[in-house]
């Protein structure tokens, strides 16, 4: 590039460098999209805009990609490195330039015909300034239409700092030439496909237009389901039809979001400023799968785990910065207080009551509203656990909203709905102190402005945040496989509840929980907490802690929990240094070295972080516990132990493996433990390696409390085979509370009601007890004896004496 064009671009770049602060999506385009910078790269933009081109250039130079303004020289021919698909509008509309894209595509394809070694990577790129979707019945053109020069100037002036450059996966022109030829018709087809690609990408980033709120309410009121519910309300409560209709409108006002792009922009500024000061980084993994789903036109339902009130903001912020539309979020009605409620509502929150029971009008209005969101194409987010986890483990799923999602599909006419499980992890959860109090019996504080301000005032260094997108679940594919006849239940008017709905929803919910856990994120805090809580004195020397973290990291890297889970790339020493900055641990120095201590008052709180990754380490921990207690054990006996206990662990921690996969998992973990020197293999028997017995014991401690809990329930069941389920749950909790006091167990979930409830249900499903409450004494005693061998004698005595003393 020389002469006048260079001067022109330099002059144009001056205001752009001041006004525009764009973001690249993905963050590292070459690495994440697999671009080969040693091969020629050309860029395709949707329409002629020099401002877009220079914005793209700034991102290319920042990410070591070829400069789009530098032409490509191929076989002596100089070709522009960028192509505009459409000439774009002009200030003077009577002048319409000839579109050059087809000619340029043809020139590039022609070069591939004459040069078999050539392979140009064609990279589609969208540059967007602002993402307002606009309102229905608004302007004729969408807000992100092609702009002429004057319009573009105002758009950049106002929205230059809310812009992003979206790189799409490259297309190989060599493959195009080989498979489809190089004539002009193929070039025209290529330009047409590129136009469709950009239109889809724009919809994925901006979303459908927003309805006027009153128009939405009028449409809902006119629906047959709500009209019938209003009539029922008037009849059952003996009120006028108008009054019943007003009740329905009041419920719509209570439920419906009031999405505002300007509020999204403002909040993005505030959150960007806040995150940079509170978090040392937000780590996002597998976002490309979601971008692809949005691009392919899927109706996306985000299903994250629920750790904190921060989840709402963090996930919307992450999605916005991944070039996706922030979803409409189902939020608990407890958050609908001033000023949080109105703000959340403008950020896309719609509010849901804890229970729908006894209020047919409410359930109908909510179901119709959710169905309307799906039919209009808005992405939706809800927390399938129904509330925040107080223990750090996943809660049993609440299936009401999921059931309504499938019922929306049974109305017909919606785009394919895909559920996207999401694991959210933190190194610091601001509510963790409150959770510990609630688990001890304190009444939950009602959310309010003073409580919110109190929480915000305590925010300090929050370390790293993690958002891992799990394996998506296309609902249509799932139903086709598991309920082939589901289409027979489609009814565009009535909310259908076919016989297959409840078991299918339960199965989908359980699968979602497994997929959320599959995307788990290990981090410095949860690894250090796991190691220190495994030590009976909650303290380890720096060397011991480093060795233990190395053990965990090697297990997770060499035998990954799943392909979606993430493990820090940092070394054990670096992770410890980072964790110490969080001010949760104390360091005592003596003449020999450092001792890292988890203070007693912090220990209960830190179990929360340990529990976040308990599922990722429970299998090696269980194996270590069995080997440690037996000193030596054959592979077959080890497998029998694991298989006997696995159904309880799978149900409690939403583990991913089926029973038939256990043998290969055990073999892989045993090989890794042998490689680390934790165990030795002699005559097909696994033996403790005395030189690494401490590391193995600390690894085994991860399963210690779980095994003690199971021992309690199996002992009670063996001692009283006719005990009913509710009494078994209650007595198990009582013994667990006693055990925690006598043996200093600092884990609130140790006697959590939900944990024992889940365990007793699993025992019923596995046939240890029947619905009438009769246990099979021989079987339960056999499992108890197995568990008794895996716990210490003093704990065993406490358990057995608890029932003998009654």
Curated annotation (Swiss-Prot):
<comment type="similarity">
    <text>Belongs to the GPAT/DAPAT family.</text>
</comment>
<dbReference type="InterPro" id="IPR002123">
    <property type="entry name" value="Plipid/glycerol_acylTrfase"/>
</dbReference>
<dbReference type="InterPro" id="IPR045520">
    <property type="entry name" value="GPAT/DHAPAT_C"/>
</dbReference>
<dbReference type="Pfam" id="PF01553">
    <property type="entry name" value="Acyltransferase"/>
</dbReference>
<keyword id="KW-0444">Lipid biosynthesis</keyword>
<keyword id="KW-0472">Membrane</keyword>
<keyword id="KW-0443">Lipid metabolism</keyword>
<dbReference type="Pfam" id="PF19277">
    <property type="entry name" value="GPAT_C"/>
</dbReference>
<keyword id="KW-1208">Phospholipid metabolism</keyword>
<dbReference type="GO" id="GO:0005886">
    <property type="term" value="C:plasma membrane"/>
</dbReference>
<feature type="short sequence motif" description="HXXXXD motif">
    <location>
        <begin position="305"/>
        <end position="310"/>
    </location>
</feature>
<keyword id="KW-0808">Transferase</keyword>
<comment type="pathway">
    <text>Phospholipid metabolism; CDP-diacylglycerol biosynthesis; CDP-diacylglycerol from sn-glycerol 3-phosphate: step 1/3.</text>
</comment>
<dbReference type="GO" id="GO:0016024">
    <property type="term" value="P:CDP-diacylglycerol biosynthetic process"/>
</dbReference>
<protein>
    <recommendedName>
        <fullName>Glycerol-3-phosphate acyltransferase</fullName>
        <ecNumber>2.3.1.15</ecNumber>
    </recommendedName>
</protein>
<keyword id="KW-0594">Phospholipid biosynthesis</keyword>
<dbReference type="InterPro" id="IPR022284">
    <property type="entry name" value="GPAT/DHAPAT"/>
</dbReference>
<dbReference type="GO" id="GO:0006631">
    <property type="term" value="P:fatty acid metabolic process"/>
</dbReference>
<keyword id="KW-1003">Cell membrane</keyword>
<dbReference type="GO" id="GO:0004366">
    <property type="term" value="F:glycerol-3-phosphate O-acyltransferase activity"/>
</dbReference>
<keyword id="KW-0012">Acyltransferase</keyword>
<dbReference type="InterPro" id="IPR028354">
    <property type="entry name" value="GPAT_PlsB"/>
</dbReference>
<dbReference type="InterPro" id="IPR041728">
    <property type="entry name" value="GPAT/DHAPAT_LPLAT"/>
</dbReference>
<keyword id="KW-0997">Cell inner membrane</keyword>
């Amino acid at each position: 590039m020389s002469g006048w064009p260079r001067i022109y671009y330099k002059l144009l770049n001056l205001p752009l460098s001041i006004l525009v602060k764009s973001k690249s999506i993905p963050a590292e385009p070459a690495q994440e999209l697999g671009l080969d910078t040693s091969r020629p790269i050309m860029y395709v933009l949707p329409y002629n805009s020099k401002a877009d081109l220079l914005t793209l250039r700034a991102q290319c130079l920042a990410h070591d990609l070829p400069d789009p303004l530098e032409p490509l020289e191929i076989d002596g021919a100089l070709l522009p490195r960028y192509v505009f698909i459409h000439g774009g509008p002009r200030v003077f509309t009577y002048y319409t330039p000839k579109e050059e894209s087809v000619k340029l595509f043809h020139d590039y394809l022609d070069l591939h015909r004459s040069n078999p070694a050539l392979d140009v990577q064609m990279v589609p790129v969208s540059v967007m300034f602002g993402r307002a979707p606009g309102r229905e019945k608004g302007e004729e053109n969408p807000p992100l239409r092609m702009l002429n020069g004057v319009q573009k100037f105002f758009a950049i002036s106002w929205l230059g700092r809310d812009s992003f450059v979206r790189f799409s996966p490259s297309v190989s022109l060599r493959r195009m030439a080989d498979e489809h030829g190089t004539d002009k018709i193929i070039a025209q087809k290529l330009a047409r496909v590129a136009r469709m690609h950009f239109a889809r990408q724009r919809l994925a980033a901006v979303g459908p237009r927003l309805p006027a709120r009153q128009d939405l309410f009028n449409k809902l009121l006119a629906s047959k389901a709500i009209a019938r519910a209003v009539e029922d309300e008037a009849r059952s409560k003996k009120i006028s039809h108008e009054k019943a209709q007003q009740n329905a409108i009041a419920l719509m006002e209570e439920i419906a979001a009031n999405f505002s792009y300007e509020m999204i922009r403002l909040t993005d500024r505030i959150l960007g400023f806040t995150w940079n000061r509170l978090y040392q980084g937000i780590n996002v993994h597998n976002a490309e799968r979601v971008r692809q789903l949005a691009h392919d036109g899927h109706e996306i339902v985000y299903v994250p785990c629920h750790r904190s009130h921060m989840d709402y903001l963090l996930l919307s912020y992450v999605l916005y910065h991944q070039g996706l539309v922030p979803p409409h979020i189902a939020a608990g009605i407890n958050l609908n207080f001033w000023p949080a409620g109105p703000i959340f509502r403008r950020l896309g929150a719609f509010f849901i009551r804890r229970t729908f029971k006894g209020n047919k009008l409410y359930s109908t209005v909510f179901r119709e509203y959710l169905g309307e969101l799906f039919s209009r194409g808005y992405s939706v987010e809800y927390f399938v656990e129904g509330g925040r986890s107080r223990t750090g483990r996943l809660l049993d799923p609440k299936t009401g909203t999921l059931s309504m999602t499938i019922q929306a599909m049974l109305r017909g006419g919606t785009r394919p709905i895909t559920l996207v499980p999401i694991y959210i992890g933190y190194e610091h959860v601001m509510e963790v102190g409150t959770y510990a109090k609630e688990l001890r019996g304190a009444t939950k504080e009602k959310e309010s402005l003073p409580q919110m301000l109190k929480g915000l005032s305590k925010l300090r260094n929050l370390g790293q945040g993690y958002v891992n997108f799990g394996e998506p679940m296309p609902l249509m594919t799932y139903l086709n496989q598991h309920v082939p006849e589901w289409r027979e239940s489609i009814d565009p008017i009535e909310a259908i509840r076919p016989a297959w709905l409840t078991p299918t929803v339960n199965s989908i919910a359980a699968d979602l929980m497994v997929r959320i856990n599959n995307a788990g994120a290990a981090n410095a805090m949860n690894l250090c907490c796991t190691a220190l809580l495994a030590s009976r004195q909650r303290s380890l020397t720096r060397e011991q802690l480093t060795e233990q973290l190395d053990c965990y990291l090697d297990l997770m890297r060499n035998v990954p929990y799943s392909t979606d889970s993430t493990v820090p790339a940092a070394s054990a020493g670096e992770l410890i240094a980072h964790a110490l900055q969080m001010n949760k641990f104390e360091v005592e120095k003596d003449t020999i070295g450092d001792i890292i201590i988890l203070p007693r008052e912090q220990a209960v709180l830190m179990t929360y972080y340990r529990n976040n990754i308990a599922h990722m380490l429970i299998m090696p921990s269980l194996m270590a516990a069995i080997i440690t207690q037996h000193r030596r054990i054959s592979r077959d006996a080890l497998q029998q132990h694991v298989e006997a206990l696995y159904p309880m662990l799978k149900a409690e921690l939403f583990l991913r493996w089926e029973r038939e996969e256990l043998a290969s998992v055990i073999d892989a973990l045993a090989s890794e433990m042998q490689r680390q020197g934790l165990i030795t293999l002699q005559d097909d028997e696994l033996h403790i390696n005395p030189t690494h017995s401490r590391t193995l014991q600390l690894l085994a401690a991860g399963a210690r409390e779980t095994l003690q809990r199971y021992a309690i329930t199996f002992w009670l069941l063996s001692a009283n085979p006719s005990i009913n389920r509710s009494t078994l749950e209650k007595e198990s909790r009582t013994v667990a509370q006693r055990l925690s006091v006598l043996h200093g167990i600092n884990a609130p979930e140790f006697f959590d009601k939900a944990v024992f409830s889940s365990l007793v249900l699993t025992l019923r499903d596995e046939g240890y007890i029947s619905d009438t409450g009769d246990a099979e004494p021989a079987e339960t005693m056999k499992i108890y004896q197995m568990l008794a061998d895996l716990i210490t004698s003093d704990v065993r005595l406490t358990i057995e004496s608890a029932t003998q003393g009654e």
